[in-house]
Amino acid sequence: MSIRIVPQEQLEQNGKSTPEGHIPPLLFANLKSLYSSRAERLRQLAADHPLGDYLTFAAGVVEAQQKVLHDHPLQLDLSNVLTQSGERPPLDIAVFPRDRHWLTLLRALIEELKPDASGQVLSTLENLEKASEQELEEQATALLQHEFHAENNDKAPFIWAALSLFWAQMASLLPGKARAVPGEHRQFCPVCGSIPVSGVVQLGTSSGLRYLHCNLCESEWHMVRVKCSNCEESSDLNYWSLDSENSAIKAESCGHCGTYLKLLYQEKDHRVEAVADDLASLVLDVKMEEEGFSRSSINPFLFPESSIE
């Protein structure tokens, strides 16, 4: 099964209603609390952590996103997007035209971060500030196409933070509802076509259900458990953790495609957060690489040094 977003009136015309016990195929981010909760979790994890300085840096970027979101709300009419997108995600990163709002967000993020920045971070922010719009657009396109270069990795978290904020704002404005339909490509976000940062096994009304968290638009989409989130095979899956079987963070590996994705279990620790806990558990990534598996996801604060397939 795949997930499509359709106009609300189309569901009503087809007589579709939400039955009792229905599994929500898609969860849009609550932007009022997303960034503040993430920043808080990053700062919690930073305490006595070997990567504490970087987690604190990431928290600062996320807090800047929260401020910029408040100061620069997106006003965009997306009423025709759902009917024009066809079988594609409505905000597909491969074809959706970016407007200059994302550059406004980037400039605002730089302005917000510069006063407290120093050293390499300050130098990177100043270089971004001096860059032409064409250079920034080219770097943004490269990131969205997963064309990574080590020499640009210092700029990537800031550019991605602006792009993510732009796409998250657009996702919140989509005038439609999601439904599960026959199809493939469940490994890609049904809103924007990007890939997950991690999977979250949830509590509450969605208790026990696995949702993949988009690393760009922050949406979450349902993916059944005990199935590889990358190739959808289920015959050769294993689960890895660093401490115990009851760990709140595990890596699900697939022997069929040779990749892994981290899963965060809210029932084990209700505080786990898709980006923060993934970033803070890099030791598990090292372990998985030693076992011969490749990461199928990308964290917005940790980009590969070279392009991936």
UniProtKB/Swiss-Prot annotation:
GO cellular component, one term: cytosol
BP GO terms, sorted: protein maturation
UniProt xrefs under SUPFAM superfamilies: FdhE-like (SSF144020)
Localization per record: Cytoplasm
UniProt KW Cytoplasm keyword: yes
Region: Disordered, residue numbers: 1-22
UniProt KW keywords: Cytoplasm
A molecular function (GO) term: ferric iron binding
UniProt cross-references to InterPro entries, sorted A to Z: FdhE-like_sf, FdhE_C, FdhE_central, FdhE_N, Formate_DH_accessory
Superkingdom of this protein's organism: Bacteria
Listed HAMAP family: FdeH
Function text: Necessary for formate dehydrogenase activity.
Membership in a protein family: Belongs to the FdhE family.
Protein name in the entry: Protein FdhE homolog
